[in-house]
Design a protein with these regions (language model features):
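Short, intrinsically disordered, charge-balanced linker/junction segments flanking boundaries
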Residues: 201-205
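Short, surface-exposed beta-edge/turn micro-motifs
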Residues: 28-29, 41, 172-174
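Mg2+-dependent endonuclease catalytic cores in nucleic-acid-processing enzymes, primarily RNase H-like
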Residues: 53-200
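A generic signature of intrinsically disordered, low-complexity regions enriched in glycine/proline
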Residues: 8, 16-20, 39, 116, ...
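Short loop/turn segments immediately following beta-strands, especially the blade-tip
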Residues: 49-51
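Short, flexible loop/turn elements at secondary-structure junctions
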Residues: 35-38, 113
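ATPase catalytic-site recognition across NTP-hydrolyzing enzymes
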Residues: 1-36
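Short beta-strand scaffold segments in enzyme catalytic cores
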Residues: 42-47
Length: 205
């Protein structure tokens, strides 16, 4: 089901979704993006950026093997199995991340600055997700606190190209997603922005 008012009208599964073996592995810079949550699962993705500034999203967690991030129920999208928290703590997430990355060299880890920096009480004072990750050896940088619309516009810009002319090395989108990242693909197809912070597909975007 494709939302009529999707925020990414240029996103096309035929054009923007590629097999995993088409994702470049040389001359790239790898980024890890984290959207932490409280009771829900964190949503994470890994992006390779090549020398032309093209974004290649090559991994997500949770994937659909954990569960769909959102489900169509009662005439609307609601949080699905993939969004349900699994009781993971900081250490669990670090082990999961290390297991998935193997020997990949990650240039930078970006985290949502709002929840990532939110303080909570611990035995000897207060801490935050960013501080706890840093202390455990996984240094994360707060992502620029852009307005949501600014972030969406940047992504729309990466997808933009002249669809009236044949695609070539210049006239093409600069954003691609691995076919294995099914939750992100669905989110880009369905996200409207109309549901604000509560919209079911917001986190993968």
């Amino acid at each position: 089901m494709k939302s009529h008012a999707t925020r990414f009208p240029k996103f096309n599964k035929v054009v923007n979704v590629v097999p995993p073996d088409k994702i470049p592995t040389n001359n790239i810079t790898r980024y890890h993006v984290i959207d932490p949550a409280g009771a829900k699962n964190w949503f994470m993705c890994w992006i390779a950026v090549d020398e032309s500034g093209t974004f290649w999203v090559y991994r997500e967690w949770p994937g659909v093997d954990v569960g769909d991030w959102a489900e169509w129920r009662g005439g609307k999208w609601v949080p699905g199995e993939g969004a349900k928290g699994q009781g993971y703590g900081i250490r669990d997430y670090i082990e999961l991340i290390q297991q998935m990355e193997g020997d990949e060299e990650i240039f930078e880890r970006l985290i949502d600055p709002r929840l990532g920096a939110a303080k909570y009480q611990v035995q000897d004072g207060s801490s935050s997700i960013i501080e706890d990750l840093n202390e455990a050896g996984m240094v994360c940088i707060p992502a620029p606190g852009l307005d949501i619309d600014d972030g969406l516009q940047a992504l729309i810009g990466k997808m933009s190209w002249d669809t009236t002319r044949p695609a070539d090395s210049v006239n093409r989108p600069h954003f691609y997603v691995s076919s294995e990242c099914e939750n992100i693909i669905q989110a880009l197809s369905e996200y409207t922005g109309d549901g604000g912070l509560k919209e079911a597909w917001k986190d993968p975007v």
